[in-house]
Structure formats: C-alpha cells, structure tokens
C-alpha cells in the first residue's frame, strides 16, 4: 500500500478549467480515509497552491515554486532554496531579444512574483 501521494496541480489535480472538481475532491477524501498522506507539489506560488488546498479542505505542507519552497498550511517556511546571486546575474545578462524568442523571465521573492519589465511592455504594446 502507498504511504503517500504527491500530486502536481496543472494537468494533474486540476481539470481543464484549472479548477478542482467534485471527482477530485472525493478521490482525495478517499485516499485520506485509507490513511494515505496526500501532498501538493507545484511550480505555482504558495498562494496559488493554497487556494487548491483550501478547496480540498486540507491542512498540509505545500511544496511550491518548483520545489524551491516548502511552507506549512499557515504559510510559514519549512524549507527554502533560492538561486545564488551569481546565477541570477548570468540569467539577466543574456540578450534574449537577440535569440529571437518570446522568453519570459519571471521569479518569486518571498510571496511576490516579478516579471521583467520589457516582457510586460511587449505583451501590452508590441505583440501582434
């Protein structure tokens, strides 16, 4: 028997409308009734994952930001692993426009989400 199930959100736990449906709620409930632990691991921020946790009526640690953060159900950090500044600097030094691709640079700092300003301008003003 399984001791735990760890599920992603998008394309896994959430339906095509990016929401939790009754089937999923009932399935998670049955899993828990069997004594199997259930966790969420996602690339989303804590707040994006917490919304799903609340819909499932769970109080569990959430693995967020592609594994860079683990927070308890109240949002207190259990684990955090940030990129070192030297790697961030290398990422921001790349001339993405010369590559000719629509590359979006974004990241989290705590619970704040940041997107590079040029990308915002592109999507608002320049994209056909």
Residues of each region from the PLM?
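Active-site phosphate-binding/coordination module
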Residues: 22-127
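Asp-based phosphoryl-transfer active-site loop
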Residues: 2-18
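Short loop/turn microsegments at loop-to-beta-strand junctions
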Residues: 1-3, 58-59
């Amino acid at each position: 028997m399984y001791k735990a199930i760890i599920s992603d959100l998008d394309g896994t736990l959430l339906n095509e409308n990016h929401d939790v449906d009754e089937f999923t709620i009932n399935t998670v409930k049955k899993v828990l009734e069997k004594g199997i632990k259930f966790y969420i691991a996602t690339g989303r921020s804590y707040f994006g994952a917490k919304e799903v946790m609340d819909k499932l009526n769970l109080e569990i640690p959430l693995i967020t930001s592609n594994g860079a953060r683990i927070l308890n159900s109240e949002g207190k950090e259990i684990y955090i692993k940030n990129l070192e500044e030297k790697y961030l600097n290398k990422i921001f030094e790349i001339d993405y426009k010369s590559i000719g691709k629509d590359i979006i640079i974004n990241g989290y700092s705590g619970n704040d989400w940041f997107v590079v300003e040029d990308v915002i301008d592109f999507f608002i003003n320049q994209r056909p």
